[in-house]
C-alpha cells in the first residue's frame, strides 16, 4: 500500500510539474504573440504616418494640377463648342454644361 501511494504521489507531482511547465510555455507564447502584434501595429502606424506625410506634401501640387486640368478642359470645351460669334466671350462666365457651352451668356 505504501509503494502504490508513493507512486501515485510521484505521478501527481510529475503531472503538476508538467502542467506548470506547459502553462509557462503557453504564457510565453501568448506574451510573444501580443508583443508581435503590438510591434506590427506600431510599424504599420509608422508606415501610415510616413505615407500620410508624403501625401500631404504632394496634395497642394496634385490639387493645382487638377485645377489646371479643369481649366484646360473648360478652355478646350469653350473653344471647340462655342457657338457665339464673339470669341472674347470664351472666358467662361458660367460653368460648361452639356446643353449650353460656357462661353455663351
From Swiss-Prot:
GO terms for molecular function: toxin activity. The keyword Signal applies. Contains 3 disulfide bonds. Expressed by the venom gland. It comes from the Eukaryota. It is found in: Secreted. Residues 1-21 form the signal peptide. Keywords: Disulfide bond, Neurotoxin, Secreted, Signal, Toxin. GO terms for cellular component: extracellular region. Belongs to the scolopendra neurotoxin 10 family. This is Putative neurotoxin 10. It comes from Scolopendra mutilans.
